[in-house]
């Protein structure tokens, strides 16, 4: 929105802006903020904050951190009562001035710089498709003597027998793909979200009800360069959640909130360009792919077990990555084939449209880390000319057992991918994009704050299995 400090100050004065919302991303991938009066904001000055209070950042004895504005990300907040401009910031060390190695936005910025330094390409485009659910009510709690969650939706398949306010037209389990209203209860809500996205610079291409019951949705918008695409995804989540909120609903990007129905994925489309020309197209190649594209795929598939530590980084992620729910559990590539983890969309003979789609990721990921890790894996494939296994153009869910045994499968748990990341991370550290400190911090954070607490707690289903044993 702005290119320099003068533009900011002029806009603030001319448009009666009251507040500047200072935003930065924590390590797990949740946007943080604090607000200052617009009249006191100097875009050229650093702002201080306590890094020890942010997940995955600093210890208390070295907690002071500095923020520097990225003015190109400025947007007027559509949800605040008083006129407010949201600006994303980079995090720096207040003493040395160096980029903070655990700042997700800095990592994405370094990934783009590393790409240019390789000479392979100068631009990487990313187009995520983040699915989500819309609910009317959600309750959850864990304590010493109870553990439960309860979700509800007017469109939920479980509400066909509801006594009050029931006019039928519920979305069946796995039956939500494309039915027209009144079965699609949320067409107007998605339209409202789409209009808000367009106002905020995200060009919507299509929106629809997804396969799952209870309002599962997908809204696609135009791709962008790596850092900008990650910023766009954070803005997308913010708008989806807040439009749902002001309509008395609640939206979640949790990968698997409903047992027995499809989870929410985040297919990520990717392409490399050099000097304004696309690098992934070759009309002579399989599915129109160039050697560069094929090697890029080879890098992602080779490093997939460790890569998933960033693209599928939660315990809940692996409730989605199971057979039977259209999840991409087979680590192969194929054209058109949605049962493959790496799909080559049919794009005709237009070189600019040629791209690869990695279907394993989910929207619980931190997009700055996930996109950076995908790029680093792909570049490792290009640099080392890593050939993927032969493409498979048949339904991978229906393979004979002897064929299926030869197909690499996704890891089945968060502990497994963290172990893989511990063993395979050199490709991430090329050019100093990911540091060993960041990788070690990520692994420790996930093991300590997510895996261990879940392992300590009895699951409600265990009572069904074992109470009367």
From Swiss-Prot:
Localization per record: Cytoplasm
Catalytic activity annotation: L-glutamate + NH4(+) + ATP = L-glutamine + ADP + phosphate + H(+)
InterPro entries: Gln_synt_N, Gln_synt_N_sf, Gln_synth/guanido_kin_cat_dom, Gln_synth_cat_dom, Gln_synth_gly_rich_site, Gln_synth_I, Gln_synth_I_adenylation_site, Gln_synth_N_conserv_site
Regulation of this protein's activity per its record: The activity of this enzyme could be controlled by adenylation under conditions of abundant glutamine.
Binding locations of Mg(2+) 1: 129, 267, 357
One of the record's GO cellular component terms: cytoplasm
Keyword list, A-Z: ATP-binding, Cytoplasm, Ligase, Magnesium, Metal-binding, Nucleotide-binding, Phosphoprotein
UniProt keyword Metal-binding, yes or no: yes
Residues found modified as O-AMP-tyrosine: 397
Span of domain GS beta-grasp: 15-96
Cofactor note: Binds 2 Mg(2+) ions per subunit.
GO biological process terms held by the UniProt record: glutamine biosynthetic process; nitrogen utilization
CC cofactor: Mg(2+)
EC category name: ligase
Similarity comment text for this entry: Belongs to the glutamine synthetase family.
Cited PANTHER family: GLUTAMINE SYNTHETASE (PTHR43407), LENGSIN (PTHR43407:SF1)
Quaternary state and interactors: Oligomer of 12 subunits arranged in the form of two hexagons.
Record's function text: Catalyzes the ATP-dependent biosynthesis of glutamine from glutamate and ammonia.
Protein name in UniProt: Glutamine synthetase
Taxonomic source organism: Streptomyces filamentosus (Streptomyces roseosporus)
Species lineage: Bacteria, Bacillati, Actinomycetota, Actinomycetes, Kitasatosporales
UniProt gene name: glnA
